[in-house]
Amino acid sequence: MIRIVDDIEEKQRITRSILTALPEWFGIPESTENYIRESANEIMVASFEEEKANGFLCLKETGKDTVELAVMGVLKTHHRKGIGRDMFDKAKRIAAEHSYSFIQVKTVQMGKYPEYDETNRFFLGLGFKEFELMPNLWDKWNPCQIYVMSL
C-alpha cells in the first residue's frame, strides 16, 4: 500500500529505518542524519507491507515552480518489484496537484559506482532527462547529476 505520511515522528522513523538499511547509498552518517532531520518538513510518500514501511520518498520545494525528489529509498529485498515506480507515480500526481511545473532529482553521475548506475537507470526509466552535471557540488569523487522532468 502506498500512502502519504503526515506525522513528523513517523516520517523520521521511516527515513531512519530505510536509509540505515541501505549503506551502499547512504553510508555517510552526517548526510543520513540530515535526510532524517529534513524529512520532517517534506512531503513523504511511503510504501507499506503489513503496516511496515519498505520504501519512501520525500519531496521538497526548491522554487515556486519546482519540487525536488529530495531522498528516496526502498529496502533491497523489495528492489525491482515496482515499489519505487509506484511511489514516484503518486508523488508526481501530488506535485502536479500542488501546481508545480517541474520535478528534479540529484544523484551521483553515471559511471562512478555500480549502485548509483542502478539509480541513474531508474530515474531515466521514469522519464527524467539529464539537466546539468555539477562535478564539484558534493566532491570530486561524487559528481552531481541533476535530472529534471516536466509535469
Give, region by region, the residue ranges found by the protein language model.
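Conserved acetyl-CoA-binding loop-helix of GNAT-fold acetyltransferases
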Residues: R80-E97, E118-R121
